[in-house]
Amino acid sequence: MGTGIVFPICAIPFSILINVLFIKKEHADNYETKIYKLLIILNFIGLILELLCTVGSLIYSQHPIIASAIYKTYLIYLISWTGLFTYYVYKISINKEAKKIWKSLVGMISILSCIFVYILPIEVVIKDNFQTRYTTGASVTFTYLICSVLVGFIIMTLF
């Protein structure tokens, strides 16, 4: 095993703590709080998926379809989290009329992107006796592109 799993393993207890504290504490019951709750739950799911990517690397030579599904699910998590965070920023920053347009736009981008991620190819690179491992291919590049566009939308909101 590489050291790539150390950070997610260390982050899981903190993520659990944040989820438990948020759920147990009383807070304002508004839409922004509900989105935040989804963000912290998605974060925990993302940590689990990141650990599963290491498992995917271990089983890739015997079960490439299962491993690819794990990797692509992680990419979809990245798009989903970034899309939801983008919507959260718009929800707290933009007037009501613009919110409807941005909600539809970000929603469509996220949904279509998830479909494309599963369609596009992905490759796994494992080197140096499992010390270096990463994914590459059109699916990964597409995910980077979509997340960059969503972050660009967030930056545009600031101005």
Task: Explain the meaning of each model-derived region.
Residues 16-22, 84-90, 144-159:
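Alpha-helical transmembrane segments in multipass membrane proteins, preferentially the mid-helix core
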Residues 98-105:
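Membrane-interfacial entry segments at the cytosolic side of transmembrane helices
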